[in-house]
Amino acid sequence: MNGTEGNNFYIPLSNRTGLARSPYEYPQYYLAEPWQFKLLAVYMFFLICLGFPINGLTLLVTAQHKKLRQPLNFILVNLAVAGTIMVCFGFTVTFYTAINGYFVLGPTGCAIEGFMATLGGEVALWSLVVLAVERYIVVCKPMGSFKFSASHAFAGCAFTWVMAMACAAPPLVGWSRYIPEGMQCSCGPDYYTLNPEYNNESYVLYMFICHFILPVTIIFFTYGRLVCTVKAAAAQQQESESTQKAEREVTRMVILMVLGFLIAWTPYATVAAWIFFNKGAAFSAQFMAVPAFFSKTSALYNPVIYVLLNKQFRNCMLTTLFCGKNPLGDDESSTVSTSKTEVSSVSPA
């Protein structure tokens, strides 16, 4: 055994060394040099300083500008809410624990932090799925003409929270558990142990299949079909400037959406899967810590991709930041509502 399992923790260091200590009671400087914990704290502070203003500004701008309160934008706001949850209840806790060098908030704090971080990440992921399905239905028209209404948007938002709770809540009630991971400064589901008391293996398989592989498959399928449909429409209207512009916008958005998600979450999912299928194998604290903390950057990717690339959102943000005047001089009233809505107009009849 190359790790030490204790009460609600697993340390990737054999107890034969005599160094392993509870991550709830002692600094974990035997796992990594103190400067690495300080560097981690600086990194989390950086994410907090960027993540909270970006997501908070998204919510503020939407509240101030009625023209942004359109059905499709509800999902974008849902992404900002998820990002805000991750920043407030995940990043701040990790910043505090990294400064101390161990999870000073104890098992209960670990469970809360792990739950909130998982909940925020899953809400964001399933929001992307809802956006993907909406685009597929509106543009590819598998159901004929379809108008995305406010009721559909609210149902989509509710769906994201139900699915996120279905993933994040089980460890709180005994199906698996949240424990410190990596450098023991943040918490996540228990991929590490075979503890039959918590049925860890069944939960991890459920989470990987239903809350990672399934949503990723849906996103790839729907956006793959979307790109093909837009390309076909563009080929039939070679002289249509709006169609060509829509094709470029869709292609750019698809690439950024897929890359943003894969860059943020695939390293973490891959390492977690390796640890799960190789229980007891030797690995360093940094081996899990690096992808775990890198995945947290997704709280920054989403508002940048889904809001800052949206011209109407961008203009409204500038108007809010500059006290009612847009320094770029763009006329908001003439701006197309969203690049996504613009794409709808090029779907084949």
Swiss-Prot record:
* Record PTM: Phosphorylated on some or all of the serine and threonine residues present in the C-terminal region.
Tissue specificity: Retinal double cone accessory photoreceptor cell outer segments.
User: Could you tell me which residues belong to the region Disordered?
Assistant: 329-349
Positions glycosylated per UniProt: 2, 15, 200
Q: PROSITE patterns in the record, alphabetically?
A: G_PROTEIN_RECEP_F1_1, G_PROTEIN_RECEP_F1_2, OPSIN
Superkingdom of the source species: Eukaryota
Q: Which InterPro entries match?
A: GPCR_opsins, GPCR_Rhodpsn, GPCR_Rhodpsn_7TM, Opsin, Retinal_BS, Rhodopsin, Rhodopsin_N
Gene Ontology MF annotations: G protein-coupled photoreceptor activity; photoreceptor activity
> In UniProt terms, what function does this protein have?
Visual pigments are the light-absorbing molecules that mediate vision. They consist of an apoprotein, opsin, covalently linked to cis-retinal.
Protein name in the entry? Green-sensitive opsin-4
